[in-house]
Amino acid sequence: MKTRAVRIYGAQDLRLEEFELSLVGDDGVRCKVISDSLCMSSYKIYMQGAAHKRVPDDVATNPTIIGHEFCGVVDEVGKNWAHKFKVGDGFVIQPAHSYQGALTAPGYSFRECGGDATYVNIPWETLHMDCLLPYNSDVFFYGSLAEPMSCIIGTFHAMYHTRDGEYVHDMGIVDGGKMALLAGVGPMGLGTIDYALHCDRKPSLLVVTDIDDARLQRAASIYTVEHAKSCGVDLHYVNTGKLDNPIETLRALSGGDGYDDVICFAPVKQVVEQSDGILAVDGCLNFFAGPGDPAFTAPMNFYNVHYNRTHVAATSHGNTEDMREAITMMNAGLLNPAAMITHIGGLDCVVETTANLPKIPGGKKLIYTQIDLPLTAIADFAEKGKTDPMFAKLDEIVRACNGLWCAEAEKYLLSRML
């Protein structure tokens, strides 16, 4: 079977092309990809090529498919996996299979598996490590967002706290504690707000910062202070770009003691310093944003490390259980990560979009891999609808859903384009 996919050949060399997939055989599974959400990690692959830790050295001659936040349906099953999968089953991928400690992952390392493709053959490692997960929903974009949501969930689980005089680490955020999300209204920050408000272990105070008023206002319109209050959380949005002394102001918002849990969403020295500066005694700083620069450093107050037990954690991905939690919460209506999505497009726009990802404003770019469609901002549907009835209808649908991409919009788009 032929697939159409975006493959990387080296630094700044992505190509959309068609090629033949290997036969599935007895020990394989083939899947049809419906949706993939683009991640900044794919931009890092684009920039670094074979220098990226997850990308093989020989991609110039054996290119790999990019995209790791994907969802679709099982298309063919070898007899050795027939007990577990059947044709037509929905699936999502947990790319971080960690087989024997390896960094290889779909969307980075495999010639025949990645999200920006029409059809893929699932790697043996993914199957063996139980990372091809069942997805019992016909809303595909939620499945694509299960992977980024699992990264957020993993972050909450990776936070830890200590006990003075005891050699114990208590895992997770402080239940009923104080939490701050710095540079926290990008797509991953929005997902974090959603999870913080609706998970079973939540803060009593949540402060979210950024330096962009428009992004803060959008976040506040989706996750309102009033809704947070109904969840038992005192939510504040703060533009630190307008503050003379952000650390002082943020500490004052905490009541002067600082924050138990702080997540830093930007690999920017100033933001890291602010994150460190607002930690409470035994405060945990999670450096969520992976820097592209191997030499990136930022100061940390080691007086507070010694006397106040401040400490750092870092997470780059979730695990399979985190993804299962994300799927369960989405299916139960407890999470709605649609706020992360600001653009939609088809497979034909992936190369240009990935290459320019940092320059394109907004949040997640959602790709429907079975169609061709220029990258289009949800905010531009109304304008495009003046000449295109499809976009006029999509605009009507999303307006009824607080301006967010939704199941009805997805179903309408695919019914028109497939």
Language model segments and positions:
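Glycine-rich beta-strand-centered segment in the early N-terminal region that forms part
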Residues: 22-36, 51-100, 114
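NAD(P)H dinucleotide-binding glycine-rich loop of Rossmann-like/cofactor-binding domains
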Residues: 57, 97-177
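Glycine-rich Rossmann-fold phosphate-binding loop(s) that bind the pyrophosphate
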Residues: 148, 184-186
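C-terminal hydrophobic helical "lid"/dimerization subdomain
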Residues: 163, 244-249, 257, 270-277, ...
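Adenosine-nucleotide cofactor-binding segment
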Residues: 176-177, 182, 193, 197-271
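N-terminal Rossmann-fold NAD(P) dinucleotide-binding loop
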Residues: 189-190
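ADP-ribose/adenylate-binding Rossmann-like module
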Residues: 261-268, 277-296
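Rossmann-fold NAD(P)-binding glycine/threonine-rich loop
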Residues: 273, 289-309
